[in-house]
């Protein structure tokens, strides 16, 4: 019975091939490697193990029919997905701890963006797992349905998956760009607030120095000038520290943006390669079934063809 289900899947994939060629690009081998060096984060290593398992599934040959129809693949992907999301959560908490000295508004915004990125990654991985489970369920139920209906539904699923990954990646890039601009504006506002706060003190010190100089003479004026210069130096030091903090924040944002963009591109390319690999697995079976079907139709037509009858003889 499993062999018959696989044969029906092959026929549907063959019918969907023409529709998918218009949506997907040329086939690309799934060779992208996740970062595994000492500098990579634990959540990146967990995500790499997730993709390693997907690559292992794609290397199956003779056992691929049975593996696609049982629940072992779904269970393994679920375990790897939970491990990855656990590492992502730990990394997010670590980043939130490092952002303690930042303003409360900026810290809340960073936490919100990190949660959005975490949710997006989890949603994409969950969608991949559910897609495999859905294919398995539809294969088990397709014997009582219309072939054209299943072919159209499967073609729609295979077209929407790359588009969805691209849309998610673009949306995440836009969110990070907006956050980066907002963080820069917030840091600039903080510097402006510092200037506004210490500016009146400097002016007040200058005014007091001028007043004291008129009352106490030149020595007191020199002391006031020294005090003013000292206060001005402290103000400049505070400004430099704030600027350094802003530069560090911008650098961290650029690193996060680059990592998210790289992960989005990798997920899109690997999803497309995985779908193309599925088609390549079943192409020999499709051709063999088409030849067998053509031979069967020809035999049936020959069997049902009426034999010619001899015409009646004429009596002269």
From Swiss-Prot:
Its main location: secreted. It comes from the Eukaryota. Residues 277-289 are annotated as: Specificity for association with VLDL. Sequence repeats lie at residues 79-100, 101-122, 123-144, 145-166, 167-188, 189-210, 211-232, 233-254. Residues 79-254 are annotated as: 8 X 22 AA approximate tandem repeats. Keywords: Chylomicron, Endosome, Extracellular matrix, Glycoprotein, HDL, Heparin-binding, Lipid transport, Lipid-binding, Oxidation, Phosphoprotein, Repeat, Secreted, Signal, Transport, VLDL. It is found in: Secreted; Secreted, Extracellular space; Secreted, Extracellular space, Extracellular matrix; Extracellular vesicle. Residues 209-289 are annotated as: Lipid-binding and lipoprotein association. Residues 265-316 are annotated as: Homooligomerization. One of its GO terms (cellular component) is extracellular matrix. GO terms for molecular function: amyloid-beta binding; cholesterol transfer activity; heparan sulfate proteoglycan binding; heparin binding; identical protein binding; low-density lipoprotein particle receptor binding; phosphatidylcholine-sterol O-acyltransferase activator activity; phospholipid binding. PANTHER family: APOLIPOPROTEIN, APOLIPOPROTEIN E. Belongs to the apolipoprotein A1/A4/E family. APOE is an apolipoprotein, a protein associating with lipid particles, that mainly functions in lipoprotein-mediated lipid transport between organs via the plasma and interstitial fluids. APOE is a core component of plasma lipoproteins and is involved in their production, conversion and clearance. Apolipoproteins are amphipathic molecules that interact both with lipids of the lipoprotein particle core and the aqueous environment of the plasma. This is Apolipoprotein E. It comes from Bos taurus (Bovine). The lineage of its organism: Eukaryota, Metazoa, Chordata, Craniata, Vertebrata.
